[in-house]
Amino acid sequence: MSSHRHSLGHEHELEPQHGLPETLPAGERLLWQGSPQRLRLALDVFHLRAVALYFALLLALRFALVQHDTGSLAEALVSTSWAAALFAVALGLLWLLADLSARTTVYTITDRRVVMRIGIVLSLSFNLPYARIASAELRRRADGGGDLVLDLLPEDKIAYVHLWPHARPWRISHPQPMLRALAAVDQPAALLTEAWLAAQPETERARVGSGAIGVSQPVALGHAQTA
């Protein structure tokens, strides 16, 4: 099903076609390519806002305790500044991970499959033919961005550790590949829906046809609104 290839991240410039492990075969059409938004990855995957808030609370607590114990505002400031520097480095590393994840990831939708090129140091390419995708779910944010979650057939499985962070959170037993943090999710959702339907037998197209499919319900599955 989902064959994958390995390469080192610095070899992306040697790709025969951007975001793909090989040039598309004759007759296969490229419909869409995109990458995650760096800021959304930082906030949603690496939880930068929550971590920053946690660090801020720790700093406030440390300042209050040192000032209470020593009675010196200067000592409290010095003690807190050292901790603040360490916390800033930690937040910077999280931001760097988000940046590298965004820059090394390319999602591709063709008329035959979805291809995910992911990985910072070790690059992996996953080919997901439409015949092996059971359904998909659109998770749209209020700003028009969002995620596309792909549900593979039960017999097909990609290890969660290989997919992360491009996997639906906490679906460990049956990992679901996820096109994350897309800036404008409606376009790839509509293209995915159309391509998936076109790849299905005529009886399946009729079963899931009018009414069940749309930008808000790609690949015949429900639509979840996220903030």
Predicted regions and their residues:
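Short, charged cytosolic
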Residues: S3-G34
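Long, distal/terminal scaffolding or interaction modules
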Residues: A26, A56-L57, N127
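Residue-level signature of catalytic and energy-coupling elements of molecular machines
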Residues: W32, V114, P188
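Flexible glycine-/small-residue-rich
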Residues: G34, D111, I118, R140, ...
